[in-house]
Amino acid sequence: MLHLVRRLATLVSVPALMLGLVSTSVAAAAPTTGAPTKLNLPDGFQPEGIAIARGTAYFGSRADGDIFAVDLKTGAGKVISQGPGTGSLGMKVDRFGRLFVAGAAGGNGRVIDTRTGRVLASYTFTTSATTFVNDVILSKNAAWFTDSRQPVLYKLSLGRHGKLPAKPQTIPLSGDYQHTAGNNANGIALTPDGRGLIIVQSSTGFLFRVDPRTGVTKRIDIGAAVMTNGDGLLLIGRTLFVVQNLLNKVAVLTLNQSGTKGTLVREVTSPDFDVPTTAAAFGDRLYLPNARFTTPPTPTTAYWATAISATTKPIKHAVDEGECDRIRFLAPAQ
């Protein structure tokens, strides 16, 4: 199922638990043998984001913001939350079962109860027409959102027991990051040590480490590699997956603990990809929604998510904001 484009290393190992910003949420181990490798989504859905928790994948529609939940064991799914009419892009689930959703051109973010589909909170980050709230990552005490049209991050500070804030904060980006025309800050992840944030700038293909206290950015040294069309990011241990949407591939990098330097170790693709936008992990697989940006959307256009083999040996603990099992990468997926 998975075609290897380039193999630069055969062993990627996962270090000790991330510290600092990292969430303490843990997901139960879940074998995926026999589960479907293609998840069919509603016709015309136009997926963009994905989050996984407790064997369920949540997909957001960039068309109307609906949230569609899929049982990873069976592939059966249903809409659990009606959208606001604007897109639902990047998403993450916290340990309380709350889905944090980036609101695209709406300039907002929502928090949804995955059990009931009820919107628990909605935040207006900006009233500017020049906005595209693109992705979100959860740390221990905050949710962080990117805006591809504004040189800022939006922060929702979480209180005791995950209490949601009354209003968001805006953190201007400075340092090496230079805002350009087109899509800018897109995917976001934590650094391996949990002390910083990582963003990918789609227009340049650069990765940046962000100081969460100040917004000061420093370009991550990844040698001559460029993350062209970089979209969603997924960090597991010191392994960073960068989904390169229009290139139909995923770059796999090994980072140092502080997230200031990395090495491209391989690139992978699948014949089932059709502009994948981001990735979430469960068991021994990565799941990627296919946005099909190059296909004109109609009410009958087919959409799906692709599951690719990511690992050979899930191990006991879980990382990455409660969404995936802690994993040792023994060899490239075949």
Segments predicted by a language model, with ranges:
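Blade-level signature of beta-propeller repeat domains, shared across WD40, Kelch, NHL, RCC1
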Residues: T278-L330
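Short loop/turn segments that connect beta-strands within beta-propeller blades
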Residues: D71-G75, D113-R118, S157-G162, D211-G215, ...
